[in-house]
Amino acid sequence: MSEQAQTQQPAKSTPSKDSNKNGSSVSTILDTKWDIVLSNMLVKTAMGFGVGVFTSVLFFKRRAFPVWLGIGFGVGRGYAEGDAIFRSSAGLRSSKV
């Protein structure tokens, strides 16, 4: 009888793999959104920089203001899209979790 008591231990409750697939944790969703927002802002800023340099060289005799203006437009657009992603469940570029 003592052998049966030792072998029969209560089952440990472990989360199944299916529950991890269906229900994502809040931190995972937030991390995914931050990754999208930061990469989006980096891409928009780089594109603004490129357009600013191109415009500066082509039209403005290599002055600095088109570059800064392009960077400003890129950061502003990235911020606006990031704000839309965080405010709504389906932003301009939503994260699929």
From Swiss-Prot:
Pfam families reported in the protein's UniProt record: DUF543
> What membrane topology was assigned to this protein in its record?
Single-pass membrane protein
**Which Gene Ontology BP terms does the record give?**
cristae formation; membrane organization
Q: Which UniProt keywords apply?
A: Membrane, Mitochondrion, Mitochondrion inner membrane, Transmembrane, Transmembrane helix
Q: Where in the cell is it found?
A: Mitochondrion inner membrane
| Cellular component, GO annotation | MICOS complex; mitochondrial crista junction; mitochondrial inner membrane; mitochondrion
Listed under subunit, the entry gives: Component of the mitochondrial contact site and cristae organizing system (MICOS) complex, composed of at least MIC10, MIC12, MIC19, MIC26, MIC27 and MIC60. This complex was also known under the names MINOS or MitOS complex. Interacts with OM45 and POR1.
Family under the similarity heading? Belongs to the MICOS complex subunit Mic10 family.
Q: What is the official name of this protein in its record?
A: MICOS complex subunit MIC10
Name the source organism.
Answer: Saccharomyces cerevisiae (strain ATCC 204508 / S288c) (Baker's yeast)
